[in-house]
Amino acid sequence: MADFDSPPKLSGVQPPSEGVGGGRCSEISAELIRSLTELQELETVYERLCGEEKVVERELDALLEQQNTIESKMVTLHRMGPNLQLIEGDAKQLAGMITFTCNLAENVSSKVRQLDLAKNRLYQAIQRADDILDLKFCMDGVQTALRNEDYEQAAAHIHRYLCLDKSVIELSRQGKEGSMIDANLKLLQEAEQRLKAIVAEKFAVATKEGDLPQVERFFKIFPLLGLHEEGLRKFSEYLCKQVASKAEENLLMVLGTDMSDRRAAVIFADTLTLLFEGIARIVETHQPIVETYYGPGRLYTLIKYLQVECDRQVEKVVDKFIKQRDYHQQFRHVQNNLMRNSTTEKIEPRELDPILTEVTLMNARSELYLRFLKKRISSDFEVGDSMASEEVKQEHQKCLDKLLNNCLLSCTMQELIGLYVTMEEYFMRETVNKAVALDTYEKGQLTSSMVDDVFYIVKKCIGRALSSSSIDCLCAMINLATTELESDFRDVLCNKLRMGFPATTFQDIQRGVTSAVNIMHSSLQQGKFDTKGIESTDEAKMSFLVTLNNVEVCSENISTLKKTLESDCTKLFSQGIGGEQAQAKFDSCLSDLAAVSNKFRDLLQEGLTELNSTAIKPQVQPWINSFFSVSHNIEEEEFNDYEANDPWVQQFILNLEQQMAEFKASLSPVIYDSLTGLMTSLVTVELEKVVLKSTFNRLGGLQFDKELRSLIAYLTTVTTWTIRDKFARLSQMATILNLERVTEILDYWGPNSGPLTWRLTPAEVRQVLALRIDFRSEDIKRLRL
């Protein structure tokens, strides 16, 4: 008997799965059922069989539900039968037509291939016949031409022979007429060698005699004989001799030039110019010959040889320039002078001026010449590279860059410009120092002499660097000028402003004198500039105001200089000078220059703040404090009396007008406007403080409103700035002080404010309302703002 406490273990019996498709057998076999003897096992199997039965019933029900759908689809299939038979017939017919067309096309294409093969063989036969005839014609023609000394015609026959297809000639030699062809070939080869020797000899004689027509005649024959490189080399040697002869003649003429001559200061630049112009004329004259007879891309070879000779002659001219102008010695003196602790006697900057001008002119002529070569070679390469690969184009570009950048001319000019930058720096620094030391002020002028002098010098130095046509040189000088203006020259103006505007109180005078003594002591220790003592208060005032004008003009001059440089360099870049990298470098230098202009503006603002706090604030504060002496808790009679005899604002306006008159005559309009703006801000701040410490009644508030309107009207006439915004808080205070009752503020506050933007906070509004002695504090506290 089985143990009924443990569950039955029916090996291999699994519960039936739901939704399995029909046609499957039960997983419980009849043999398994017969083998069961326990009631519990039989009940378990029975339950599983019942479950399988239910699944089968559901599947049968599902199939029966699909009966109508299946029957309708079968009817549709029966109806489609005839149509499918027609389609089958059409498809078979189409397949037959395609097979027929394919066979026909295959037959036709095979015929066409046979025709193409026959045509190609015919062309080859004709070509072979033509080449044999050409060979015979060339052999006969070259012999005749040589006898008649018609070297051009002989070269044309040789060129035609050289252009024949060698494989066709080789096939012809293997035919029946091979011996005759061999004989013709031998004669042609002998004629070729003979003609090459004749042309070389005739060319040498022509160059020796300087017979240009004969030189050009035989120069044109070289490429017909396949001697492109040799022809260009020999012709270049001839041209180089001419260049050398003319250059030596010009150099001798230069060395004999009298120093009183009008062009004596630039004779070496003129010599280089003549050299470059001579080579440029040679290139322009012979470029058509080279392109016509040698083909595109060959001009580079000719110019490469010419540039070698150009480098030799440039080296001679520059050596003479360095020796005669004492260029290296001058540079060493300048280097020593630039050292802070140098004891070497200083060179007078005027002595350097003509040398620096000549160097920049020499470099400008060199840059122009190199741009000419670049343009000519590039255009020649473009014609030949129209169908070339990208690799060939890049290789040609590398050759061009190497020729222009690595030639001795470029290296020599770079060396000269490198020394020039240091010497130009010395020239600029020394002349700026001299302009500062000789600074003078003429009565009636807003600025002193050093501003115009310094910027004339800076513009001259930068303009000279610009005339060199070297972006690197220009950027170096812009950077040096930026440093000179930012450090040394700005320090001079800064020191003058730090001496302060002469004060009126004892404490301010003491502070100003101490500051001035410290600054003068520091300047004298540095040894940069001489500091002259201030002999009187008036002179000190004028010095401060003139310095403010100087600072403002400096800022404007720097901005103008930046715009001018942008315009001038746009022309340079449009001429192909420099590239994207040079453009970025130049833009960076201009950004630094613009930053210096901003620093001068900042210095101007510092000076104005000092002037405002030293000269204006000590005067304005007592005038505003006199507001306390005028009661604003008044009756109708006093209000009418105030209207006839204003107790405060008219005197205050008169005091301001007298105070600002001194500055208006001595300051530029821009600075005066800025100073008036600072004064206005000061007035609003101080007046607000006074008002918040005063008390008012209704008529007193009305009186204050009239006073404020008069003050605003006056200040509006003396400045171009919009000042109503500065008085917004005070105007709103006047509005509040004019209210008839406390709750009237709600007509102007919050949603009822309209376009008005309140500058006063709710707490400040309550504070102003509390200034009215006739308003109860309980009413003010009850306001919901």
From Swiss-Prot:
Biological process according to GO: Golgi organization; protein transport; retrograde vesicle-mediated transport, Golgi to endoplasmic reticulum
Phosphoserine modification, residue list: 6
One GO CC annotation: cytosol
Keyword Protein transport: yes
Membrane topology designation: Peripheral membrane protein
Subcellular compartments: Cytoplasm, Cytosol; Golgi apparatus membrane
Region named E domain: 741-785
PTM annotation (N-acetylalanine): residues: 2
Protein origin, superkingdom: Eukaryota
Chain intervals for the UniProt region annotation (Interaction with SCFD1): 2-84
Keyword Cytoplasm: yes
SMART domains on file: Cog4 (SM00762)
Renumbered residue ranges of the record's region Disordered: 1-24
Residues covered by region (D domain): 618-740
Keywords: Acetylation, Cytoplasm, Golgi apparatus, Membrane, Phosphoprotein, Protein transport, Transport
Region described as Interaction with STX5: spans on this chain: 85-153
Oligomer status and interactors: Monomer. Component of the conserved oligomeric Golgi (COG) complex which is composed of eight different subunits and is required for normal Golgi morphology and localization. Mediates interaction of SCFD1 with the COG complex. Interacts with STX5.
Protein family membership: Belongs to the COG4 family.
Record's function text: Required for normal Golgi function. Plays a role in SNARE-pin assembly and Golgi-to-ER retrograde transport via its interaction with SCFD1.
Listed PANTHER family: CONSERVED OLIGOMERIC GOLGI COMPLEX SUBUNIT 4
Protein name as annotated: Conserved oligomeric Golgi complex subunit 4
Organism: Pongo abelii (Sumatran orangutan)
Taxonomic path: Eukaryota, Metazoa, Chordata, Craniata, Vertebrata
